[in-house]
From Swiss-Prot:
Parts forming coiled coils: none
GO biological process, one term: nucleotide metabolic process
Official protein name in the record: 7-methylguanosine phosphate-specific 5'-nucleotidase A
The EC number(s) this enzyme carries: 3.1.3.91, 3.1.3.5
Record bears the keyword Nucleotide-binding: yes
Predominant location: cytoplasm
Amino acid sequence: MRLPVLGKDTVRMRDPEGLQDKITRIQRGGQEKLQIISDFDMTLSRFSRNGERCPTCYNIIDNSNIISDEGRKKLKCLFDIYYPLEIDPKKSIEEKYPLMVEWWSKAHDLFYEQRIQKDRLAQVVKESQATLRDGYDLFFNSLYQREIPLFIFSAGIGDVLEEIIRQAGVFHPNTKVVSNYMDFDDNGILTGFKGDLIHTYNKNSSVLKDTEYFKEISHRTNILLLGDTLGDLTMADGVSTVENIIKIGFLNDKVEELTEQFLQSYDIVLLRDETLDVVNGILQFVTAKN
């Protein structure tokens, strides 16, 4: 039986029959064996609304009044240089890797110069255009109610990401976030970022020093992985035993050029789909009691 939600016109599948087999196997395993691993920016959050681009965690800071006009220009200049390289279909991940380190490092240096205050972040998020994808409440709340762990692995800013989810009223105890977290001094002024830099193309076990999380849930060998770049495909590398994994890719930009590449790697590719309908549909099916 094919799930009706997979008939949506935004859905592309590499191997519909193989996918259905995986869905059935995950359903048989039950919710006790399931975990979710997801990217945040442009995966759980929207890419656009009414034709306007929605901001990433970094954009929220870049575009806010806690950054000077001069700082904003410099950050925009970095975006204009590096974003096209990040999504360039002709460049390999190996070529993109050092470029992403450059971009993130330069952006962080600009942030330090701005002496960002911790107590202003909540207001900055509130005033931003950041929006979670339609269906986010069902997604976060049903995972919490069913005690299914949600691991968010983000190259964004952890403090901002958490605030977005908190302000939406869906930040629950089953959610664990690994991201770039800001480090503040005793006066609440940004002095740096904690731990290793996480960027688009190193979201793998190399930055997951704290794998205690995956050890604790090692019995959860079925995974739904959600991402929006080819760099997100390695997010489950920290899981020691994987029985079944369904990879769902949100293809938001350069759709025509990247569809084929995405289909080689993701089981399901969602073309310009600003909802979590497909994810929620699969979750409802695999966690149904009968």
